[in-house]
């Protein structure tokens, strides 16, 4: 699952991050991955989007992928402010569309609420930050989190295979295994998970946004169940698409 796109590195606020930025001088679209993800999480999406004459931007969030994992609290506030700084660094300060999955959706929503950068469209894919703070996760989510305790590549791949609808490629499992071994990676993972669950739920505040919001959720999503889509149903600025499995 190696990215075929040219990657760049930048040092922002003392943290080295990896990112891609292609088709500059066009309408920008930012991809924000979820917990444990990276640029490669979007491999099957970036290609088709690139052909639509859009500027495609994606980054490894601090603490994930091949970006640095300093010893800090990986709060939603930290991430939203950092991503805005990243966009400013690469020259994006105008209307932008954001596509965020899980944790990435929660970060994108925070950016929209704070309005630090003009966001015209926000696509939320099974976003975190919606279930109540009392939500302790599903068996599937807890199974996913067990990758942190995997002692070998084979054990990690078995965990991923048990969560997937089909076979998991060795190349994909290897990326996750190797990156979890990077200094500070597991600590960053745990911090981001805890901070995500502690953050304010964003569904009420996002109603005030002028951005167009699209919510995608899998009917059989076992990580963050479909029932948590309910707050969006009543929002006039939201369109909802339920994906059949």
State where each predicted segment sits:
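Alpha/beta-hydrolase fold catalytic core
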Residues: 1-29, 51-54, 85, 92, ...
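Active-site loop/oxyanion-hole signature of alpha/beta-hydrolase fold enzymes
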Residues: 12-13, 20, 58-100
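Flexible "cap/lid" loop of the alpha/beta hydrolase fold
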Residues: 109-114, 120-151
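Conserved HGGG/HGGXW glycine-rich cap/lid loop of the alpha/beta-hydrolase fold
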Residues: 15-66
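Conserved alpha/beta-hydrolase "acid-adjacent" motif
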Residues: 222-228
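Gly/Ala-rich beta-loop-alpha elbow adjacent to hydrolase catalytic centers
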Residues: 100, 104, 108
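Conserved alpha/beta-hydrolase catalytic His-Asp/Glu region
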Residues: 135, 151-208
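Short beta-strand/loop motif that positions the catalytic acidic residue
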Residues: 209, 215-217, 221
């Amino acid at each position: 699952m190696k990215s075929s796109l040219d990657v760049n590195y930048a040092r922002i606020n003392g943290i080295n991050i990896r990112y891609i930025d292609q088709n500059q001088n066009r309408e920008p679209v930012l991809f924000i991955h979820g917990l444990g993800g990276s640029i490669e999480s979007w491999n099957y999406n970036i290609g088709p989007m690139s052909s639509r004459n859009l500027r495609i931007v994606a980054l490894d969030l601090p603490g994930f992928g091949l970006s640095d994992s300093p010893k800090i609290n990986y709060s939603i506030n930290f991430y939203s402010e950092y991503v805005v700084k990243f966009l400013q660094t690469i020259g994006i300060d105008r209307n932008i569309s954001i596509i965020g999955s899980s944790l990435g959706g929660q970060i994108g929503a925070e950016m929209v609420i704070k309005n630090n950068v003009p966001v015209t469209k926000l696509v939320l894919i099974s976003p975190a930050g919606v279930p109540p703070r009392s939500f302790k996760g599903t068996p599937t989510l807890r199974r996913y989190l067990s990758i942190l305790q995997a002692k070998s590549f084979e054990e990690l791949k078995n965990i991923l295979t048990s969560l997937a609808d089909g076979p998991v490629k060795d190349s994909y499992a290897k990326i996750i295994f190797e990156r979890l071994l990077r200094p500070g990676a597991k600590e960053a993972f745990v911090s981001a998970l805890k901070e995500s669950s502690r953050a304010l739920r964003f569904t009420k505040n996002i109603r005030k946004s002028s951005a167009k919001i699209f919510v995608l959720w899998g009917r059989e999503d076992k990580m963050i169940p479909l029932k948590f889509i309910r707050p969006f149903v009543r929002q006039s600025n939201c369109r909802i698409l339920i994906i059949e499995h």
